[in-house]
Amino acid sequence: MVDAKQRLLSAAVDYVAEHGVGERSLRQIAAGLGTSHRMLIYHFGSKEGLLVEIIRTVEARQREVLADLAHEPGESAGDMARRFWRRISDPALWPNVRLFFEVYGQALQGRPGTTHLLDDVVHAWLDPVIALGIAQGLSEEDARVMARLGLAVTRGLLLDLLATGDREAVDAAMEQYIVSYEAQLPGRTSPLS
């Protein structure tokens, strides 16, 4: 059974995906969810607390997508990465991506209520991506380095896409990264050599 907090959080994720957050107050968000701001404060502590939980939920869902893609039989590492990129760079997710970067920036500046986002914003991704790299044949050391690089490239290109809207150039950059990643896998030769 899903508790009230989980129902509110799920509704908030959907609300942000459809409407974004922008300058909406906690009262406005609550009204959009059909609840009171007091209920949101009770469950999440503050507007910032709610936004951090929305981000964590969206990020967890994205990691689930990655895990599901990793279990596709016969699919190359590059094909899996391309499908994941298409999924997370889908314009339907842009409100969530904008929220991620907004709150991430606030957390880096030390804004109260947001700093606990920093606890797992990188590390929650590393272990599953490292495991994926090892499964694809990388050494643990190489998988660790490539996981961090892949996370940085992906987030950087998402930011580029939001800032410029240049889908063609951003997709070309991601394709180049994927090709260079595949070249690191055992049994592959570098297309750059």
Functional labels for PLM-detected ranges:
Residues 7, 11-49, 53:
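Helix-turn-helix
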Residues 56-62:
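Short, basic, alpha-helical segments at the C-terminal edge of helix-turn-helix-like DNA-binding modules
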Residues 73-76, 109-112, 122-147, 182-193:
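Hydrophobic alpha-helical bundle segments that form small-molecule/ligand-binding pockets
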Residues 77-79, 92-112, 116-119:
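Amphipathic alpha-helical segments used for helix-helix packing
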Residues 96-104, 127, 140-161, 172-180:
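Hydrophobic alpha-helical segments that form the core
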